[in-house]
Amino acid sequence: MSNLHSSLNGSASNLPDGSGRSFTASYSGQSGAPSPSFHHTGNLQGLHNIHGNYNVGNMQGTLTSRNSSMNSIPSAGVQQPNGSFSSGRFASNNLPVNLSQLSHGSSHGHSGIPNRGLNVVGNPGFSSNANGVGGSIPGILSTSAGLSNRNSVPGMGISQLLGNSGPRITNSMGNMVGGGNLGRNISSGGLSIPGLSSRLNLAANSGSGLNVQGQNRMMGGVLPQGSQVMSMLGNSYHTGGGPLSQNHVQSVNNMMLSDHPNDSSLFDINNDFPQLTSRPGSAGGTQGHLGSLRKQGLGVPLVQQNQEFSIQNEDFPALPGYKGGNSEYPMDLHQKEQLHDNAMSMMHSQNFSMGRSGGFNLGATYSSHRPQQQPQHTSSTGGLQGLGLRPLSSPNAVSSIGYDQLIQQYQQHQNQSQFPVQQMSSINQFRDSEMKSTQSEADPFCLLGLLDVLNRSNPELTSLALGIDLTTLGLDLNSTGNLYKTFASPWTNEPAKSEVEFTVPNCYYATEPPPLTRASFKRFSYELLFYTFYSMPKDEAQLYAADELYERGWFYHKELRVWFFRVGEPLVRAATYERGTYEYLDPNSFKTVRKEHFVIKYELMEKRPSLLQL
């Protein structure tokens, strides 16, 4: 099979990925064991895409010989009739061998070719990273099939490990290898997994292995375990061989199948988005998510489980009325213990440790404390010693903790979680006692603190709080007269001084003058009117003074800003001006000045203000 792999990995032709098309019915499968995933048209149902490109430019013209060996295993069933790829999106005469005619022959039980024969369908993608040659992988059912109807990798049998090659992977995964890199390398030199009828050997130190690219959705949408499996396949695992028990495969089945091995739905909101369908609340959403993980057989780390337990019991510890628990969404004791069992079973050699840096954490295990309810959690020991895998370096895992320490932590956690009701009652009692002690300590600056001061025997503090009884100081509170005449101060030793007798002059008793009116300005002299006009701008009195000045024959010049008074009749009177002798008031000297033959234009004379009659 490695020879076939090397001959199909050319680089001259780079054909883009397209829609898968199966070969004609003449490429039917040969005789062999029954396989429920082997379609009668020659399609191998399973993964949708293993690689996006098919390079066939440098394929050799013929295979080596009729008795060619596949990974040092002779296979008499390798036939060499003439033929070519006549269907699909490409045609090439460089490979004259019909790949579907590479029947098993005498190679039953040897290389990784399924018992139904090597059936290549569509535009298969044989990348340099899919090596299914040599070794044996027992542990997965013999009815395993090949890969999808678009791309197929010979020698890799897919049973329930990949969803029993059902449409759940085919429809929802789309193009597993078209984008990024879901897994890097899984290289093994003779990794032996007993129980697989379709043998799988990962080539040693080849830097290849199962290289599935693309950041796509696994198992019918964005399942929570998709990223876990990506992390499981995330790094290189160079091993020297060793048995991989059935429990390891079964744990992966539990992760990937999610209790629906034959479900063909493209979208399941309960599995794809568990937080949308879980109950509300700070602890409820996480509890619903853990419930979905428990249903899928997927565990959570111990640290996360402990955090969920604390959040579940103490949602809002700062509230004084908190009594613990949740009346709307109670979580029974059996459910908590069962969630914890799933968490602990995920952290040991029975399951793969879903860490961030990848790697199989196959350490020694122990039996579950509830074997009658979860018998699948028991596993065998010695997995890590046989495989020689490096431990997981993720902070969420406990690979760096020894076996004895892990057992002690688990037993300690079990002893604490056996009595959650007693713990809640003790917590409530502690809170009640703490609240009582807090209430008993009175604030010294409130009324209760003042009462404590009043009860003391210190007279100075009592006088500061209550004051002094003035009757003890000689103050007659029943007197009808003024008290200031007889009492000066409580802290003085001298008697109160007598009141001094004095008389107030009559001028201080003058009545308030009446307010000014328009009639009042008629009694004012010229000087007082001019003073009122210039000293009270923007005031009502200024308008009254100006009105009275107009009444007495004065007018205001807007350009010179002075008051003029006519002396006699004007000498010349025209339509726009007049000329004669005038007197005006100089505001600087506050005196009247005479001007003869002075011309005054009418447009420069201010009109008389119109005032309301008061």
From Swiss-Prot:
Residues 1-46, 58-89, 361-391 are annotated as: Disordered. Residues 364-381 have a biased composition (Polar residues). GO terms for cellular component: CCR4-NOT core complex; nucleus. It is found in: Nucleus. Its main location: nucleus. One of its GO terms (biological process) is regulation of DNA-templated transcription. Belongs to the CNOT2/3/5 family. The gene is VIP2. Disruption phenotype: Impaired stable genetic transformation by Agrobacterium T-DNA. Keywords: Crown gall tumor, Nucleus, Transcription, Transcription regulation. Signal peptide: none annotated. GO terms for molecular function: mRNA binding. It comes from the Eukaryota. This is Probable NOT transcription complex subunit VIP2. It holds the Pfam family NOT2_3_5_C. Transcriptional regulator required for Agrobacterium-mediated stable genetic transformation by T-DNA integration in host genome, but not for T-DNA transient expression. Interacts with Agrobacterium tumefaciens VirE2. Binds to VIP1. Forms a complex made of Agrobacterium VirE2, VIP1, VIP2 and single-stranded DNA (ssDNA).
